Regions:
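N-terminal presequence-like segments and the immediate start of the first folded domain
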Residues: 1-71, 77-129
């Protein structure tokens, strides 16, 4: 069975998708950006990353996971040099857990003010080892 989860407390999708899909104890989280609930976007990458990670945490919990259950994360940056900013922040969120990871520089995100987007896969905690 496929379960789709829309999270009312985070930025709502701007297209035809949902925040989280869960099937067979696998969790897929759609791309999350650093836009606040009031549609404001901080100017700096660190604050945008923190907003995206806050929403990421909300999505994980709604699907029965947490940061320790993440198996793969993809981070999209509009400036690859910003990895120096987000790498220490990733350690704050993930701690000793090291999921598989891909970091990509992209020419643009959905809004030209956006600097970072995160998407991921995880497993439900009851299946985590």
């Amino acid at each position: 069975m496929i379960k789709r989860i829309q999270i009312p407390d985070i930025l709502q999708p701007v297209s035809h998708y949902c925040h989280v899909v869960e099937a067979n104890n696998i969790i897929w989280i759609s791309g999350l950006v650093g836009m606040n609930y009031n549609n404001s976007i901080p100017e700096n990458t660190k604050d945008q990353f923190d907003i995206a990670m806050r929403d990421f945490d909300t999505c994980l919990k709604a699907a029965g996971g947490d940061f320790s259950s993440v198996t793969k994360v993809r981070v999209f940056l509009t400036n690859i040099d910003d990895r120096k900013i987000i790498n220490p922040k990733r350690i704050e969120y993930f701690g000793e857990h090291k999921p598989a990871s891909t970091l990509l520089e992209v020419s643009a995100l959905v809004d030209p003010r956006m600097k970072v987007e995160i998407e991921a896969e995880a497993i439900k905690l009851k299946w985590a080892w």
